[in-house]
UniProtKB/Swiss-Prot annotation:
This is G-protein coupled receptor 37-like 1. It is a multi-pass membrane protein. The N-terminal region is required for constitutive signal transduction. Disulfide bonds join C203-C286. It comes from Mus musculus. The keyword Phosphoprotein applies.
Length: 481
């Protein structure tokens, strides 16, 4: 039985060690279970506000932008996206949900932002002024186009009227025609719709053409005045052959090139400016502001021209032709003597022709001064009182400035057709032949007409529309009478 004691001792040791291990394992497992339960209780449930991944989803970028949503293909597409200045539209004291409303107000309807303003319909308070401007523009356009085309066609188709004098008048009519045909529709369209046709190109081309037209008129009046002075003081015979085409083109080239060279700074001075309209879209306007991309030397010259433009405009395009005409007329009157005394070397018909030419020069100068005076007054007022005037007043002065140029282009050919007898008679003959088909039959039915009357009719018709077979005799200087 002695061997049972070691067995009993070993069993007691094994049991003691096993019970202690089991109790430790149970205790550790119980502690681990409690820790797991506490961890599960401390972890927030899914969908609550304290969830970790949700904090990452609340990231707000520094700037947010709205991109155009797909719209109907027939609608107008916005030109650029609109960005908000605030990082979060819900902040800065705004209530939640105002961000979407802000974006809708900024974006607006594309058709409303890019549509052309039409003040003619529906009829409002501004419609009456728009209709008045359109009616006045149509009258000026019709009168100017018909008159200038008539002067150019008469001089072109008449052999006896192809002199330097009449060619200068025809070139004057050509420039007035170009100004009325191209500049008048652009200016009226901009005044009514507040949109500029051809954009920046028209802002530069319209002032260039208008100033070139003023230069052509100025130098033409100076050339006509010099011609009258030369005729009055020259001791050479008062008649000479019809001038050749090369001589006429050389004189016209001097006038045209000089006028266009003086108008070149207008191409670099004007720019297109767009401002937001109070209702919808933008308002186009042309402003005098040289481009910063110009070379430094050119930019300084343009700035100098801008600063001196008003007085240069007044001196060169207003005072110069008036002083030239007045001086030449005074010298001519002094050389020719009082109206009652006629020189012995001059016939009565030639004296009448020269008097008519002098009246033409004086009439052109008076009309030119009358039409350009409002333009110069507006330039001076804008230069010195622009800060004290409202935007509506400045726009009105600009419109008066433009219409004064258009009035000059429309009244000048009418004056030429009324004062210059050959041009006026040719215009009436042309209208009679175009409107009355019985003009030719009336001459055939009159069988009792004398031979002198027939000869006079043939000479009269050949003067204006037919080139004679042989070289014509010597003709008086200027417009034949």
């Amino acid at each position: 039985m002695r061997w049972l004691w070691p067995l009993a001792v070993s069993l007691v040791v094994v049991l003691t060690v096993g019970l202690s291990g089991v109790s430790g394992a149970a205790t550790s497992s119980l502690g681990g279970h409690r820790a797991k339960v506490q961890e599960q209780q401390s972890r927030p449930r899914r969908g609550t506000k304290d969830e970790g991944p949700k904090e990452v989803q609340h990231y707000v970028p520094e700037e947010w932008a709205e991109y155009p949503k797909p719209i109907h293909p027939a609608g107008l597409q916005p030109t650029k996206t609109l960005e908000a200045t605030s990082p979060n539209p819900d902040k800065d004291g705004a209530t939640p949900g105002n961000g979407q409303e802000l974006r809708v107000n900024l974006t607006g309807t594309p058709s409303q932002r890019l549509q052309i303003q039409n003040p003619l319909y529906p009829v409002t308070e501004s419609s009456y002024s728009a209709y008045a401007i359109m009616l006045l523009a149509l009258v000026v356009f019709a009168v100017g186009i018909v008159g200038n085309l008539s002067v150019m066609c008469i001089v072109w188709h008449s052999y006896y009227l192809k002199s330097a004098w009449n060619s200068i008048l025809a070139s004057l009519a050509l420039w007035d025609f170009l100004v009325l045909f191209f500049c008048l529709p652009i200016v009226i369209f901009n005044e009514i719709t507040k949109q500029r046709l051809l954009g920046d190109v028209s802002c530069r081309a319209v002032p260039f053409m208008e100033v070139s037209s003023l230069g052509v008129t100025t130098f033409s009046l100076c050339a006509l005045g010099i011609d009258r002075f030369h005729v009055a003081t020259s001791t050479l015979p008062k008649v000479r052959p019809i001038e050749r085409c090369q001589s006429i083109l050389a004189k016209l080239a001097v006038i045209w090139v000089g006028s266009m060279m003086l108008a070149v700074p207008e191409l670099l001075l004007w720019q297109l400016a767009q401002e937001p309209a109070p209702t919808a879209g933008t308002v186009d306007s042309c402003i005098m502001k040289p481009s910063a991309d110009l070379p430094e030397s050119v930019y300084s010259l343009v700035m100098t021209y801008q600063n001196a433009r008003m007085w240069w405009y007044f001196g060169c395009y207003f005072c110069l032709p008036i002083l030239f005409t007045v001086t030449c007329q005074l010298v001519t009157w002094r050389v020719r003597g009082p109206p009652g005394r006629k020189p012995e070397c001059r016939a009565g018909r030639h004296e009448q022709c020269e008097s008519q030419l002098n009246s033409t020069v004086v009439g052109l100068t008076v009309v030119y001064a009358f039409c350009t005076l409002p333009e110069n007054v507006c330039n001076i007022v804008v230069a010195y009182l622009s800060t004290e005037l409202t935007r509506q007043t400045l726009d009105l002065l600009g419109l008066i400035n433009q219409f004064s140029t258009f009035f000059k282009g429309a009244i000048t050919p009418v004056l030429l057709l009324c004062i210059c007898r050959p041009l006026g008679q040719a215009f009436l003959d042309c209208c009679c032949c175009c409107c009355c088909e019985e003009c030719g039959g009336a001459s055939d039915s009159s069988a009792t007409v004398s031979a002198d009357s027939k000869l006079k009719a043939e000479v009269s018709s050949s003067i204006y529309f037919h080139k004679p077979r042989e070289s014509p005799p010597l003709l008086p200087l200027g417009t034949p009478c």
